[in-house]
């Protein structure tokens, strides 16, 4: 059974804080089943985006799986914002969590699909 989105996000925010990063909900989506996008800002001007993995890459052993969007690279923050705006136009119930970390860590651990 999958955790409700709101609970997963709260736990993720705590994980980021425990590791010395600042994380905040930039867009609050559906509490029960909204998709979550993670934006990691490094150095204030560049960002990477992590998106929910497609259904075929989902694994029963993990609550949620992630893929690196935008080629898995840090891009100018305005490009990351434009990509997220496109996602919002498709899904108005999605969440966006922004993480500010000097090292650019995403804190998704093994849940990231390479």
Please tell me what each predicted stretch does.
Residues 1-114:
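Polybasic/polar functional segments that serve as interface/processing modules
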